Structures are given as structure tokens and as C-alpha cells.
């Protein structure tokens, strides 16, 4: 595509508020972008100041910045320069965007996605050498600005309001915060969304944005130890996640499976088989809980520690070890003819048989903790070194235990 032809292509969609052609014209991917890089050539500052054509205000420079971006991306392979040009393009776009209605939101989403991709490409070498991500830091601020422009729209109402873009831009901002290691800032975005009565209900957002929003709310609740809320939000996200979105399902299950382990609720083998990476990590823990195999559980905790920490689920999986202890103690109780009085020594020997050799006092502490948490019904006779269990259902189902 020749330069003048490219420039003229903006006139009709801008006049008729048609976002579809703009998606093709302003994408940094695809044949159109590569064609511009091939035919337009380098963009110098002289052309930026005197583009030689007339488009609606600001669009002269927006068009030229896009040419500069794709030239750097495809011709000089200067990813930092490509990112910088895309970031400058968005700064110009925002100045025009504040006077527009929701018709242009798809274009905003695409340009923000492209900006994030370019930031990651620009930071690859720097991050490997220094651990820093300067372009992604800038990207995060630019994306956050887009959220603010959507959330503060007072010019348009209803379907035309830019507030329709709140959830998409909020989720993208949260994703960027996690990328740059600042998840603590996510609460500011969430508070801005939920505290503003003018924010549309999440139910009115496109389903993909709803799923992403519920996922992030659930993940943040998970990280904050709010198990019930996390389970509800992640379960909703999984239920409504498209069947063919396997990667997104895997992200949701990464947090949902550990939560379910706490309640003795296990994913089916067929579900796990669809996600081999999760199957490899979690199947041994599931089997260990079912069998009361504390030694195997501890071995797997050590084996998977680095991966579990990287997934941010280590602490919850470690807590789920209590379910494994419960299964073992229940087996010991059943081997004692389901007596309501079980010596501490019986539980100690059960642990020893599974490779956990501890003193009676420590076993007593374990039992006391399990009684406190609701895994056992009964009390400890310290003088007689005896656990006195309830006559009915001394080992409640894990799914009924309040967490």
C-alpha cells in the first residue's frame, strides 16, 4: 500500500464512525502493516511535522506514527523504537478519543494489545540481562490511562458511553500490573470499578470480558486468602469460559484445583487429562489425599515446590496436607474398630508407617489442630494420652467443613 493511499483510507471510516477498517489500518500485525513497512519507508521528523495531507485533527500524526512503528518493527527490527512509536501514537489517540463514543472501543483494545506485545518484545533482552522491564512499565501507565478515559466518561450515555470499555481496560491494566510485579495496585482498579455507581454491571459486558474479570477477582481473592470468594469467582469463570479456550481454562484451574483440594473435591480424570501440565502437578497430591499417604504428599511438595511457588499456589497446596492427615487418621480409627477412644500412640504409629516419625507430643498437637479446624469431632484427654471421638460422624466430610 502506497503512503498516500494509506492516508486516504482513514477518511471514510472516521467520517462514518466505522471501526472495522481502522482495525486493519492500525494493526501492527498482518499484511497491511508489512506492506506499509515495505512501501512507505523511514519516517523522519520532517514528515512528522509536515505530513502533506489533511485528516481530522491529530490523525495526520497518528497515521505517520503508525508508519514509523511498523517500519521499526519489520525493517530495522528495533523493537524499542517500535514500542516508543506505538506509545506516542496512543498518546495522540487519547486526545482524540476523549470526544468519541463507544464506537471506537475495538480500535482502542487492539492498539493496547499491540502496545503490550511490542513492550514484551522490547524488554526481552533487557529483562534477561537486568530483570527490569522499562517498556512494560511505560505500557502499564498507558493502559491505565485508557481505563481512566473509559471510566470517567460523562459525555455519552448508555450504549454510546465509553464506560462500556471499563471491564476490558481494567482487566488489561490488572494483567500489566501482574506482569511488572505490582499486584498490590490491582485493588485500586477494582475499587474504581465497583465503587462508582455509574459503572455498568459486569453482566452487560461481553462474555470474554466477564470471564476475565471474574478470573482476576477470583485470583486476587485466592492470593489474599479469601477462599470462599475465590472459589465462587473462579468457578463462575470456568463455567462460562469457552470450551475451546484451553489455555484460559488452565489458568483458571491453576487456582481452582488447589482450593478444591482443601475441601476434598477433586477434578475428574477426564478434565485433568485435557490439561497435561496440571495433571502432572496435581494428580500425585489428589492420590495422596485419597490414600492418606502423608509421606508421598510431603515428597511431592518438595518435588513440586519451585513450580508451585511460581504458580503462586504453594501455600494453599501445603494447607491441603491437612486433608491427607485426616484420611490417614480416619484409616487408623477404622483399623481400631471405629472405637470412640483412640490412643495418641495409634496415630503416631500410623504416621511412622508412612514415613513421618514424630514424638507423641507433636502428634497430639496435630490432632488438636485438626479438631480446631473441624476435621475431627472430639477432644483430647491429655492425662490418658487418648483422643475421645464423637459417637456420630467423627470425621466429617471435607466438603462440609467451613474454611
Swiss-Prot record:
Pfam families in the record: PCI
GO CC, alphabetical: transcription export complex 2
Q: Which residues form the PCI domain?
A: 211-394
- Report the domain of life of the source organism: Eukaryota
| Swiss-Prot/TrEMBL GO biological process terms | poly(A)+ mRNA export from nucleus; post-transcriptional tethering of RNA polymerase II gene DNA at nuclear periphery; transcription elongation by RNA polymerase II
| Annotated PROSITE patterns | PCI (PS50250)
Can you provide one Gene Ontology molecular function annotated for this UniProt record? Answer: double-stranded DNA binding
User: Sorted alphabetically, which InterPro entries does this protein's record hold?
Assistant: Csn12-like, PCI_dom, WH-like_DNA-bd_sf
**What family does the database annotate?**
Belongs to the CSN12 family.
Name the UniProt record assigns to this protein: Protein CSN12 homolog
Organism name: Cryptococcus neoformans var. neoformans serotype D (strain JEC21 / ATCC MYA-565) (Filobasidiella neoformans)
Tell me what gene encodes this.
Answer: CSN12
